[in-house]
Design a protein with these regions (language model features):
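Inter-helical turn/loop segments and adjacent helix faces that build the functional surface
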Residues: 208-219
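AMP-forming adenylation/ATP pyrophosphatase catalytic core
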Residues: 2-30, 46, 50-52, 81-83, ...
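Core alpha/beta nucleotide-donor-binding catalytic domains of modification enzymes
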Residues: 1-210, 236
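A broad structural signal for alpha-helix termini and local helix breaks/kinks
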Residues: 113, 213, 277-281
């Protein structure tokens, strides 16, 4: 296992042995194994741990991680957050809120310490569980290819990669490593709670699938590798199409050439719309199939108001051959008159009215022929 991870660190994670790495350590087997392997490969490490404020054992977990850092003479940073309040305020599940807060903390530390990467302890088992979750939610190729070993750009940074050195290692190998090297991970009892969706997959669905095929996890893992390669091919096609279809872009809007977009194969159209959404909502995961198909249907047959509410507070609007994806509050470039679809104005005939950005709408009677 150590030889495999060493090669991944060098060849796939592309880590420099001389620059700091933020290593996320919860204290569980996966992250403790990651810490130990990185340390034994002499990477300069900063051990980062976030107390989510959710479990009574949280403080003792933080102390356990601190001791592991001190044992190796490594710098330790501790963050604390109120995940439950954040989840309630943003209508998120506790699991999703914890994930967001954890990565925000990790990448804040990475910027603070000028780290070359953030390393997390995702394993091959995590990959299988993630892909199953995406499959059951109706994800496309981008979801079924799973998590990359090195992600740059990612939802948290365009400059600092997120790396997963243990992605090719199975959980059984992790547990064996911990035993062989006398590592004492903390045990998070919430991982046994099957009311949590991922835990239910891990403890109920996957064992059930293994009764049909004992190697189902290995099969699913290989499938992610195949799909990741095919996705790379598709991405190159989409990169070229993006250059021709993108007309304008700002912090709160993306403008696409509707005519060129419609001429693309449907698979490329889907990916172009996904990319436009990702530009404005980089943190958004698992863009659902229905939203993408609704966007493409709107492109083919616009609604009466020429705009629809698409996803995550974004609207899609068609203006001539220009397809806008924008936040509802976006101020669009004034090459065309802008008027929210739900507004109405009274226009006398003859008469004129002023529109935003200096535009004037004028009506006149045409003499009958």
């Amino acid at each position: 296992m150590q030889g495999l991870v060493r090669a991944i660190l060098r060849d796939l994670c592309l880590l420099n042995p001389d620059k700091p790495v933020i290593v996320a350590v919860s204290g569980g087997p996966d992250s403790l194994c990651l810490l130990d392997v990185l340390h034994k490969n002499s990477y300069p490490l900063i051990v980062a741990h976030l107390n989510h404020g959710l479990r009574s054992e949280a403080e003792s977990d933080a102390w356990a991680v601190r001791r592991e850092a001190e044992k190796r003479s490594l710098h330790f940073v501790l963050g604390e957050d109120d995940v439950a309040t954040f989840a309630a305020d943003n209508a998120l599940s506790i699991e999703e809120a914890a994930r967001i807060k954890r990565y925000q903390f990790l990448f804040t530390q990475a910027e603070k310490f000028d780290a070359q990467a953030v390393a997390v302890g995702h394993t091959a088992d995590d990959q299988v569980e993630t892909v199953l979750m995406h499959l059951l939610r109706g994800s496309g190729l981008s979801g079924l290819k799973g998590m990359p070993i090195r992600a740059l750009p990612n939802s948290w940074s365009r400059d600092i990669p997120l790396v997963r050195p243990l992605m090719s290692v199975w959980r059984t190998e992790i547990l064996n490593y911990c035993r062989e090297h006398d590592l004492k991970p903390v045990i998070d009892q919430s991982n046994l709670n099957t009311t949590i969706y991922r835990n239910r997959l891990r403890h109920e669905l996957i064992p059930n699938l293994e009764s049909y095929n004992p190697s189902v996890k290995q099969v699913l893992y290989r499938t992610t590798q195949i799909l990741a390669g095919e996705f790379d091919v598709l991405e190159r096609v989409v990169d070229q199409a993006w250059e021709s279809v993108l007309l304008d872009q700002g912090k709160s809007f993306v403008a696409l050439d509707a005519a060129i977009l419609e001429r693309q194969p449907v698979g490329v159209r889907r990916q172009l719309l996904r990319r436009a959404i990702a530009v404005l909502r980089p943190e958004l995961r698992d863009i659902d199939y229905e939203s993408i198909e609704r966007g493409l249907a709107f492109l083919a047959e616009p609604s009466q108001t020429n705009q629809i509410d698409l996803v995550a507070g974004l609207r899609l609007m068609l203006e001539g051959d220009r397809l806008w994806l924008a936040t509802w509050a976006a101020e669009l470039p004034s090459s065309w008159p802008q008027m929210a679809g739900q507004d109405s104005l009274r226009l006398g005939v003859p008469g004129d009215i002023l529109l935003p950005a200096g535009w004037r709408l004028r009506a006149s009677k045409v003499a009958e022929m």
